[in-house]
A protein has these predicted regions:
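Short, structured beta-strand/loop micro-motifs enriched in basic residues and often containing a Trp
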Residues: 1-8
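Short polar catalytic/cofactor-binding loops
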Residues: 8-10, 28-29
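Active-site/ligand-binding-proximal alpha/beta "capping" segment
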Residues: 85-87, 161-172
Length: 172
């Protein structure tokens, strides 16, 4: 099992193999459908981007309300295919990792290979457990989207599996 840190480096990414378990530490940014839509609209309109995503990881997640005394609420993955239409633009912008659940389209897999990125899978239905790996959480963009806003999470040993590696190999 590899332990890796963000921001992701090309060497780290290229050493990962499909199906391999990984523990990720560092910063990840949550973003679901509506945040992806806004990010890609900002790219198309050449607007100022709300954060620098170069070499960063996006987690397809909309955390639930934070319970008193906790860092974050439940934070399980959402279906990655819903982000497929937005993924190529974000990979071109420098995103190097994505975390979610489920298959990616052939087009997204080709773009992952082209941009030497990686797609990670994490455990569906385990949002409360995954929250235990989050050390800090802060809202960074699109507050009006509620749980679909972009949050900056500091994670420690967040459990993942390589779903699509930088060579375009997929577990599916």
């Amino acid at each position: 099992m590899q332990k890796i840190n963000t921001p992701l480096e090309k060497k780290q990414i290229c050493n990962l193999k499909v199906g391999e378990p990984v523990l990720l530490s560092g910063i990840v940014y949550t973003a679901r459908d509506q945040a992806h839509k806004r990010l890609t609209e900002a790219i198309k309109k050449k607007k100022r981007f709300p954060l620098d995503l170069r070499d960063q990881v996006i987690y397809y997640c909309g955390p639930t309300k934070t319970p008193k005394g906790k860092v974050i609420g439940s934070c399980g993955p959402t279906t990655s295919a819903r982000m497929d239409a937005f993924t190529p633009a974000l990979l071109m912008r420098g995103v190097k990792g994505m975390i979610g659940k489920g298959r990616r389209s052939k087009e997204v897999i080709a773009d992952i290979k082209k941009h030497k990125a990686v797609y990670f899978l994490t455990f569906s239905g385990c949002g409360a457990l995954l929250a235990k790996y989050v050390r800090k959480s802060s809202l960074v963009a699109y507050k009006d989207l509620g749980p679909e806003a972009i949050y900056k999470l500091e994670v420690k040993d967040f459990p993942l599996m390589v779903g699509v590696d930088s060579r375009g190999n997929s577990v599916y």
